[in-house]
Amino acid sequence: MNVNLEKKYKNTIVKELFKEQRFQSIMQVPVVKKIVVNMGAGDATQNSKVIEDITNELALITGLRPVVTKAKDSIASFKLREGMPIGAKVTLRGKKMYQFLDKLINIALPRVRDFRGLNKDAFDGRGNYTLGIKEQIIFPEIDYDKVKRVRGMDITIVTSATNDADARALLRKMGMPFKK
């Protein structure tokens, strides 16, 4: 696994983006600020053990202890009360962020069944990219035999880019496999 994604960014990607995107200063070149990995569990209202499973899996995948997310409002039709645990999330920054991004690009995404590339239109208009993964078993840390239920997750990559074009160029240079 290439752990030097951060070095690659600092040594080559910054210079290439500076020339291509016509920035006035090298400090305007976008950088990945943080990555937020979120797993929701709708069945956590009936079974409290589900949250424990999710937090363990997220901890294995990211290397950090997740924060349990709780419901903001009560919804009677979902048998949900305010304050009930309904998921978990991890915010990655620094070295762990670059390691996770490298693992996502080079190991996890190629293991997705029928993978034809990421949607290049999933940017939010402010330079952030969100992708959904249907199975947590694409990550090498997860043992398929120990998984009780296959769950998906949301991964949000927050960049300092002010528009989608700059963020797309940054992520493409980092190796994100976007659809053509």
Curated annotation (Swiss-Prot):
Keyword Translocase: no
GO (cellular component) term, any one: ribosome
Entry keyword annotation includes Iron: no
GO molecular function term, any single one: structural constituent of ribosome
InterPro entries: Ribosomal_uL5, Ribosomal_uL5_bac-type, Ribosomal_uL5_C, Ribosomal_uL5_dom_sf, Ribosomal_uL5_N
HAMAP family: Ribosomal_uL5_B
Family: Belongs to the universal ribosomal protein uL5 family.
Role summary: This is one of the proteins that bind and probably mediate the attachment of the 5S RNA into the large ribosomal subunit, where it forms part of the central protuberance. In the 70S ribosome it contacts protein S13 of the 30S subunit (bridge B1b), connecting the 2 subunits; this bridge is implicated in subunit movement. Contacts the P site tRNA; the 5S rRNA and some of its associated proteins might help stabilize positioning of ribosome-bound tRNAs.
Protein name: Large ribosomal subunit protein uL5
Source organism phylogeny: Bacteria, Bacillati, Mycoplasmatota, Mollicutes, Entomoplasmatales
